[in-house]
UniProtKB/Swiss-Prot annotation:
GO CC, one annotated term: sarcolemma
Keyword Membrane among UniProt keywords: yes
Species of the source: Bos taurus (Bovine)
Quaternary state and interactors: Interacts (via SH3 domains) with CACNA1S. Interacts with CACNA1H. Interacts with CACNA1C.
Lineage: Eukaryota, Metazoa, Chordata, Craniata, Vertebrata
Gene assigned in the entry: STAC
UniProt-annotated location(s): Cytoplasm, Cytosol; Cell membrane; Cell membrane, Sarcolemma
Region (Disordered): 1-43, 212-253
Protein name: SH3 and cysteine-rich domain-containing protein
Domain SH3: start-end pairs: 286-345, 348-403
Amino acid sequence: MIPPSGAREDGVDGLPKETASAEQPPSPASTGSQESKLQKLKRSLSFKTKSLRSKSADNFFQRTNSDVKLQADVLAGVSPGSSPLPAPGSLTCTPTRAGLYPGGGGKAHAFQEHIFKKPTFCDVCNHMIVGTNAKHGLRCKACKMSIHHKCMDGLAPQRCMGKLPKGFRRYYSSPLLIHEQFGCIKEVMPIACGNKVDPVYETLRFGTSLAQRTKKSSSGSGSDSPHRTSTSDLVEVPEEADGPGDGYDLRKRSNSVFTYPENGTDDFRDQAKNINHQGPLSKDPLQMNTYVALYKFVPQENEDLEMRPGDMITLLEDSNEDWWKGKIQDRIGFFPANFVQRVHQNEKIFRCVRTFSGCKEQGQITLKENQICVASEEEQDGFIRVLSGKKRGLVPLDVLENI
């Protein structure tokens, strides 16, 4: 049966209306163009991220404005429907040079040509500075930093720390006493203004000397203390019996420190008088302050005392632990404390005539030729016990020469 014409028209009209009401699918050309733009954007961002990671901070902050403009153009080409990205102005804010290098505002090293007379190591490569004829190198005028010529490029991020604090620094001639170039200053000169001395420094120096002298007197033999009757002491020193203040005046006038009295105030006054006069009235105080030189010491300053192995030294002051003041004949000066050996009463001084290698299992020690040692015991079976510095043991008597 053939449907009526009106119904056919409604069905035909209804189909276009249905398709018109539905959404039209996007064309394949427009879809491909959007996907290609997004892929290009992702590639550009990933490429720039990798390049930024591989570069250092300096290269990142020193980029030219053309890179920033290129990035802004790429970001401007993004469709407005995509997710918003940070503005290009936020990426262009770079820190200053001072922020990258906090010490950039410091002083630079003022290096000068220098000839090193002593073994010196480079502060950059830690190798010794050695030249063909002399030890040439560079040294900073302010902080005394020593480097090679070739190590000049390695000091770019460093700055000069300025001059070291003023202090009492000695430059030793023995390799046992060489300190590092920037080691701490162990000795400081007393704070003095005119004739005034810092009371705190004076008190500490006096206490240290008193403790050392007390320990030495207690370790020595009992015959080291003087033996005199109280009558003779009163006759020889009549002005010292007035009161206890006189003993304090004696200690104040003398640089030496006295031991504690064992036999009363008379022995204390007698010992003070002997040390003040520096005379050969008694052998005991002189014997307590007698030392023998173990090694050779070449003076580096005018106040140093030259020593040779075997020289007899009279100790004048030992307030400092490292440097003592002594006298050899008519010469007075300072010398290293570990270069000498104390000589007690009834001790003999020997010099080794040839090298001897001892056996530790048998209590023997090794002595080199011309080495100085001290002995207080008698010979036993051809061996004698000697003391040289920190070494103590048995040595055959035929390798020793009494000096």
